[in-house]
Swiss-Prot record:
Modified residues (Phosphothreonine): 199
Molecular-function GO term, any one: unfolded protein binding
Annotated source species: Chromohalobacter salexigens (strain ATCC BAA-138 / DSM 3043 / CIP 106854 / NCIMB 13768 / 1H11)
Pfam families: HSP70
Protein name: Chaperone protein DnaK
Zinc listed as a keyword: no
Length: 644
């Protein structure tokens, strides 16, 4: 078996490392640099340039020079953030046939994984030149908050580059591996704050000695997949554009050549201000008007830059609070803080993080290289070269299905250790129902519509039977890469259907970030909605039971009693169309009372009618029968047959 290399496929820069004699080593590229810009350019003579060569010619070829492509992976063209990106980048973002966001270069549409594959090829060749042998296997890192679609797309990029991706590993987890491998033995809880070029992650990780084995267990992870160094650059670019406009009256934002020069200058100034208190952005001949050429010359102080980006830094602290809360820890219980990603070199970022955790971050972890080093170590673990290391990562978002009334029923909760498999038994909601729909969701909202649909599929040809009798086993299988497989099986016939969540149905970066924020902001709203749905389900169940009792009673019920029950049914059905919980409860109580005497009468003749009546419907889906049986399409029910 050949070497398994470790690749940090970054938004701004990428890095490759190998395990050499038990130690991880970052490999220099052909230009002698340890990191490679994640930039790809297509020239007029048909050549594809990657890395520094592509970056050097960007000013003269802006429309065919692609950067920050990682931020497009898993996105739909119509997403708000993609529409915003279209206005900010000099190249063309186009809509693919399936609605995804692709790029267009010289009349050809390219998928983000295709473009990312060019960077991976460069990393692959860098490793091959160093090792003197072919490399076919790799561990590739992704932001911890990447969704299923983005992980799939990253694997696709690896395959296009000629690499078998042995494992997708989360960037903060990889950094923890790099940190923990050469440290003294002992249990520690560390926080990895990863602010890269395009994404932000925070992971709380416990490093422990367990029977002589170093165990890295992720306790919680959180993040923002649309926050990174690119956003810091944009803030400074906007400031420079405004300054130039106020001085000259000319707006540079529509000039792609000028904006490309500004982007380079802003990035350079931002980096300089991490060490200096002031720098000068000097761009001669930036544009021209009837009076002649115009030059841009703006002094920028560190204080000015910090005032421009302070809100961005502050935005990174909310996920930190959530991650600590999910891990059940306080900031004072964190033993070490590790900073990862080039943007963490900014003094303001270091100060805010130190203030938040109450301690300075370690300085012995290289923020640009730690992730690739960790990926190489994981490659060594998979290849058997590294012993006594166990990595326990987690899934960042809850996975579940839609249940009765539009509620999301979780199967795998967020921060569950992966790989994992969860099964639950569902049943039919209606008599003689022959099919159920399994609607797979990802997110933190109770209301299904507030989460992202990952896909749906039907299990058909269920033998006709009374409601609640068929048993349909739904299985969620989440692998070590965080990629999901879902299957549904009719236990009586053995008939099975399954779905692998594909990239075209995945979440966008903005959607993931937004759904977590929405969940926190709408917690009370969600609770009220859930209670209303449960009450409606109880009402539906009571209506079903009352009608069935009337039907079975036949001529044994007198006309006045029958009319009273039918009136109560109509009033309850009308009440459930509204949102007034008290009104629904009153009508439910009225029907319960009206049908109580009749049900008691019938109980002696038909012992199981009362239990049947207590069951609740599950839309097209399902109903819980026993401890592990819940409404297939829709709602869980307790053993006492009452809706939760």
């Amino acid at each position: 078996m050949g070497r398994i290399i470790g690749i940090d496929l970054g938004t701004t820069n990428s890095c490759v490392a190998i395990l050499d004699g038990g130690n991880a080593k970052v490999i220099e590229n052909a230009e002698g640099a340890r990191t490679t810009p994640s930039i790809i350019a297509y020239t007029d003579d048909g050549e594809t340039l990657v890395g520094q060569a592509a970056k050097r010619q960007a000013v003269t070829n802006p429309s065919n020079t692609l950067y920050a492509i990682k931020r497009l992976i898993g996105r739909k063209f119509k997403d708000d953030v993609v529409q915003k990106d279209i206005k900010m980048v000099p190249y063309t973002i186009a809509e693919a046939d399936n609605g995804d966001a692709w790029v267009e270069v010289k009349g050809n549409k390219l998928a983000p994984p295709q473009v990312s594959a060019e960077v991976l090829k460069k990393m692959k060749k860098t490793a091959e030149d160093y090792l003197g042998e072919e490399v076919t296997e790799a561990v590739i890192t992704v932001p911890a908050y990447f969704n299923d679609s983005q992980r799939q797309a990253t694997k696709d990029a690896g395959r296009i580059a000629g690499l078998e991706v042995k494992r997708i590993i989360n960037e903060p987890t990889a950094a923890a591996l790099a940190y923990g491998m050469d440290k003294a033995r002992g249990d520690k809880t560390i926080a990895v704050y990863d602010l890269g070029g395009g994404t932000f992650d925070i992971s709380i990780i416990e490093v422990a000695d367990v029977d002589g084995e170093t165990q890295f267990e992720v306790l919680a992870t959180n993040g923002d997949t649309f926050l990174g160094g690119e956003d810091f650059d944009l803030k400074l670019i906007d400031y420079l554009v405004q300054q130039f406009k106020s001085d000259s009256g000319i707006d540079l934002s529509g000039d792609s050549l000028a904006m490309q020069r500004l982007k380079e200058a802003a990035e350079k100034a931002k980096i300089e201000l991490s060490a200096a208190q002031q720098t000068e952005v000097n761009l001669p001949y930036i544009t021209a008007d009837n009076t002649g050429p115009k030059h841009l010359n703006v002094k920028v102080t560190r204080a000015k830059l910090e005032s421009l980006v302070e809100e961005l830094v502050q935005n990174s602290l909310a996920p930190c609070k959530t991650a600590l809360s999910d891990a059940g820890l306080s900031a004072s219980e964190i033993d070490e803080v590790i900073l990862v990603g080039g943007q963490t070199r900014m003094p303001l970022v270091q100060k805010k993080v130190a203030d938040f955790f109450g301690k300075d971050a370690r300085k012995d972890v290289n923020p640009d290289e730690a992730v690739a080093v960790g990926a190489a170590i994981q490659g060594g673990v998979l290849g058997g070269d590294v012993k006594d290391v166990l990595l326990l990562d987690v899934t960042p978002l809850t996975l579940g299905i839609e249940t009765l009334g539009g509620v999301m029923t979780p199967l795998i909760e967020k921060n569950t250790t992966i790989p994992t498999k969860k099964t639950q038994v569902f049943s039919t909601a209606d008599d003689n129902q022959t099919a159920v729909t399994i609607h797979v969701l990802q997110g933190e909202r109770k209301q299904s519509s507030g989460n992202k649909s990952l896909g749906r599929f039907d299990l058909a040809d269920i033998p006709p039977a009374p409601r609640g009798v068929p048993q349909i086993e739904v299985a969620f299988d989440l692998d070590a890469n965080g990629i999901l497989n879902v299957s549904a099986k009719d236990k009586a016939t053995g008939k099975e259907q399954s779905i692998v969540i594909k990239a075209s149905g995945g979440l966008s970066d903005e959607e993931i970030d937004q759904m977590v924020k929405d969940a926190e902001a709408h917690e009370a709203e969600d609770k009220k909605f859930e209670e209303l749905v449960q009450l409606r389900n109880q009402a539906d169940g009571m209506v079903h039971a009352a009608r069935k009792t009337l039907e079975e009673a036949g001529d044994k019920v007198d006309a006045s009693e029958k009319e009273q029950i039918e009136t109560a049914i109509s009033e309850l059905e009308e009440a459930t169309k509204g949102d007034d919980q008290e009104h629904i409860q009153a009508k439910l109580d009225a029907l319960t009372e009206a049908s109580g005497n009749l049900a008691q009468k019938m109980y002696a003749e038909q012992g199981d009618a009362g239990a049947e009546g207590g069951e609740q419907p599950a839309g097209d889906g399902a109903q819980k029968k026993e401890d592990d049986v819940v409404d297939a399409e829709y709602e869980e029910v307790n053993d006492d047959q009452k809706k939760q």
